[in-house]
Regions:
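Membrane-interface helix termini and inter-helical loops of multi-pass transporters
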Residues: 68-70, 127-139
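Solvent-exposed interhelical
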Residues: 171-197
């Protein structure tokens, strides 16, 4: 991927974020309690999550392995943090989910496209397009790096705890929907997504 392609995708993803933000005021995304047959074909929720999230983990792994700077300290640590997050989201979180919900195939495919682009753009920048000398070993001695690492693990802790709160809302056999009230949900509507946002501020 060249610099121009990267910049185009950066603008396209930013524009798409605005479009989706506005659209979701008028359209209910058809998963969870809003899943309806109108969304067409659907897949098992656990399978859908794995297929949707795994591409970003695999794309980043491929780009890292083929990079000449893959074992440089700073890029390598960024890579490990990134993969730690997405390994949990791709291969652990789905199998902890309870219930028999289904995910619309259309939403899963949109997630695949987003995650492929997410992995491509972050991996290409980190391992191929970043200016030479930007991510040197000296980066590891800066306060901003260690503050970012601390924020990453705080965010991950919030995310994991919030997911646990959601999983324990219902007793076995109960199919009703409940609003979580514990942990970060006392302060924000989506404690799990808030945790991910904090994680993403690591760099």
């Amino acid at each position: 991927m060249g610099q121009q392609t990267f910049e185009f995708l950066l603008l396209a993803m930013s524009a798409l974020a605005v479009i989706v933000f506005v659209a979701l005021y008028y359209v209910r995304a058809g998963y969870g309690m809003f899943h309806t047959p109108k969304w067409g074909l659907s897949v098992n929720n656990k399978l859908g999550w794995v297929l949707m999230e795994a591409p970003v983990f695999l794309v980043m792994l491929y780009l890292w392995w083929n990079s000449s700077v893959r074992f440089d300290a700073a890029p390598f640590l960024f890579f490990l943090l990134f993969e730690l997050h997405y390994f949990q989201r791709s291969f652990i979180f789905p199998f902890l989910m309870k219930g028999k919900s289904r995910m619309p195939l259309a939403i899963m495919l949109m997630g695949v496209v987003f995650n492929v682009l997410n992995g491509l753009m972050q991996g290409e920048w980190l391992f191929y397009l970043a200016p030479e000398g930007l991510y040197t070993d000296a980066w590891l001695g800066t306060p901003s790096f260690w503050l970012g690492v601390i924020l990453f693990f705080i965010g991950m802790g919030i995310n994991l705890h919030s997911d646990s709160v959601i999983r324990h809302l219902r007793k076995p056999g109960d199919t009703r929907h409940y609003l979580p009230q514990k942990g970060m949900y006392r302060y924000v509507t989506s404690g799990n997504y808030f945790g991910e946002l904090v994680e993403d501020r690591k760099s």
